[in-house]
């Protein structure tokens, strides 16, 4: 999937005029792409449209109008757009009680080795953004990719084959099937140009 192009990013005035409709459309787009695995992990699968929304919102929040800064934001956020034969997601580690955040995150150190996408009897381990990791600490927001490759991407597009997100961390073991509207939305990413 190609990234967001400069000509697709609106200036602040033009964006403000369509923002309400764009926000409503993005909320609907993200609904089937938000997948909980257990009670602590939520994957929000990204594509060009979700990333474009994030770019527009960041430019709006920071009141960015300088061309070089706009191009910088596009470049940074385009790293979230999945490449060919892959899926990408923002992984949110949800910890509702502030006083538990550090302890719960510490319990999940090493999670980058334990997240998988299964399709039929095949599996691919998630690739985490190395820039977000230290050996003794993780953050509550992670960026992950599932590099399926051509064969597994093709298999994922076959709704007859079961697919699921699976976490096998010693302190957190859960899985969630990928089906219905969620699966269809991710399939559309894999076939997009």
Residue positions per predicted region:
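Long, contiguous binding/interaction regions
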Residues: 1-86, 90, 94-193
